[in-house]
Amino acid sequence: MEKYCTKLNEKTDEVLLSVKKAAKSISDMVAKTAGPFGSNVMLINGPNCRITKDGITVLRYIVEPETEADKIALSVIRSASDETNRKAGDGTTATCILANEIFQQGYQFLTAGLNGNLLRNGIVKASGIAQKMVVDSLSTPIKDDKDIYNVAKISANGSDEIAQILTDVFSKIGKDGMARVELSNTDKTTSKIVYGMNIDRGLESPYFATNEHGEAVLDNPVILLINKRLSVLGELLEPFKLLAKLNRPILVVAEGYDPDILNTLVLNKIRGLPICAILAPNYGEDRTKMMEDLAIVTGGKVISPQTGLTLESIISDQSILGTAKQVIVNGESTSIIADTSVIDKERLDKRVAEIDHVLEDETLNDHDKRIAKTRKARLVSGIGIISVGGATEAEMHEKKDLVDDAFASVSSSLKKGMCPGAGLTYLAIHDALYEWLTKHIAELSQEEASGFRIFADSLTKPFLTICGNSGNQNTQYALGCIQNTNRSEHGQDSELKPWTKCVDFSSGELVDVIERGIVDSAAAVIETMKNGASAGAQLLSLSGWVSTPPKPQVQQQM
């Protein structure tokens, strides 16, 4: 029974103080990387060393925290930054900074006797209002290649090379396009476009992943397209015996999976069968059309009641199976790099012409028009392949991190727009939140209002960090100057507008950040505030921990 024993630390003040110190230590390390003048961090793992300026990479590299407090702070902050990275591709350092600042400021209120859960309510409320401000007033859509270049350059830490490559790639794959980032065999970074299709469906289970990045990479797979829910285990047995004999990876695309079916597929994957399952794209009639599109791209056929094909049909007719050169599946989406030798060009052209004919219908509603445009884009666009080169393996890995983040940042910006960078958007929201609080203070309790102020005041920290990393010794003075400049420009205007005036930290001159191309992805700003607030509030509500004691080491007798 000893291995199930737990230890409860009931001294709340000691718990919070130790976690507070741990969170600050973690944040200080990550914050060094913020902004154009941020420092690199050396990651050392035995004889292997790696240099990075990527906040989330630093967080992921801390694998053995020394104390329970370190583990708690790291787990909460890293989870928040991971979520920001997954949704926006950028803003991970800002998420870490914001989460820690909320915790540090909130700690002072806790020691004064305020209720942590009510503080949390105020923090979360302020975060929700702030996110809406970005969507409603502070973001602008990406208009052209110049905007794409600027977003990519900021996310890639000022790399003109990466920004130009991504601009070229997105000009060819479109805003819904996908790209595969890989290491090159040379010192050059290059890109190319291959024919394929992207669908917004990811791994049905993380157990299907084949690499450390949580992706399933299937080379020359067989593809099974099933426009119905898989619910009868017996239907799979004979067809899958045949598929296993082909000695090729298997991608299953189906409307849905009963738990028993999915568990069986996962179990077979664990036992060595190279299989991956995803959901079919979209719903209803739209799903039927998209499955037929997939059949054209993969050279296969759709199994469904409408086509009259069943799983057993595979045994006598293997032409039902589709294929591809490669399929990459992550948690969110699937990229199919087509094997053009199996595509019926006449069938493909006819399909695109059918969609064009549908789009000519002036009575088409907005939903059907959007679906038709998406289908056409997926049928005619390609997939970007970016091969990252460098003089050393360490340089290649560092550059690949930047390309991954910049691609995701541009992709999210094309969907949600961009905002002024350099921390200015957070400063504009800071003022707007205080204006909101002045009008609605009666609606909040004392603790909730304090939590609201904690979040608002914490929004100045990203700017202060970027400013400090540039070598400025008086960051508070710089903050005051920038706030006064932008407040004066907007005057008494009650409408919330983006702040755009900031000091160029390299030259010291006052500039318009939009004109200088200093921009952030709106999605990154939104996710930073959402996840930073969640993490900071989580830490504030902590009162103790339960831990399993380490197993005693058994000394071997000589």
Where are the regions a protein language model picked out?
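Generic N-terminal targeting/processing segments that precede catalytic cores or assembly contacts
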Residues: 1-83
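Glycine/serine-rich anion-binding loops at beta->alpha junctions
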Residues: 6, 10, 84-94, 418-420
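Helical mechanochemical/support elements of P-loop NTPase systems and associated helical scaffolds
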Residues: 15-18, 22, 26, 38, ...
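Extended, low-charge hydrophobic alpha-helical regions
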Residues: 17-19, 64, 69-71, 270, ...
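Residue-level signature of catalytic and energy-coupling elements of molecular machines
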Residues: 19, 35, 89, 113, ...
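Long, structured protein-protein interaction/assembly regions in large complexes
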Residues: 63-64, 128-420, 545-558
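Metallocofactor- and cofactor-centric catalytic cores in central/energy metabolism, strongly enriched
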Residues: 85, 116-117, 121, 125, ...
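Short, flexible active-site-proximal loops enriched in glycine and acidic residues
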Residues: 85-97, 111, 116-119, 133-145
